[in-house]
Amino acid sequence: MMNRIVIYTDGGCRCNTGIGGWGVWLKYGDYDKKLKGNEKKTTNNRMELTATIKALEEIKSNQIGIDLFTDSKYVITGINEWMKNWKVKNWETSKKRPVKNVDLWQRLDVLNKQHDVIWYWVKSHSNNKGNDIADELANLAMDKISLS
């Protein structure tokens, strides 16, 4: 059986300042890659979504399955439950309001269709090595922008 790519993502925001960061740890066999980035005016949910988008954009082949782990219930519930209805309702919520972060959700939708992704929720700060690494990368990205 072919190994699957394992991805851990995390996003965060120091919302009193609006500074946000995201982190990604990709692992495939002995290969691993770490990615991180930041934005000056953002939200926690946008950073969580951005982390998953950046991770999936990094995967060039659609021939290998992906196990994607995130501590964001917003991302997990959105991708597994809400998105189907949003698309039927032309990206409106059940209360007929525009979906927040629709630009990112639409990008994630395209990427999710291009890959065989199994989505997993992992509890944050629970000594999960992959989640801890992604969290550390997101915080390093926020620290970098805080110091500049």
UniProtKB/Swiss-Prot annotation:
UniProt domain RNase H type-1: residue ranges: 1-143
Record GO terms (molecular function): magnesium ion binding; nucleic acid binding; RNA-DNA hybrid ribonuclease activity
Metal-binding listed as a keyword: yes
Cofactors that this protein relies on: Mg(2+)
One family name in Pfam for this protein: RNase_H
GO biological process: DNA replication, removal of RNA primer
Catalyzed chemical reaction(s): Endonucleolytic cleavage to 5'-phosphomonoester
GO cellular component: cytoplasm
Record family assignment: Belongs to the RNase H family.
Protein's UniProt name: Ribonuclease H
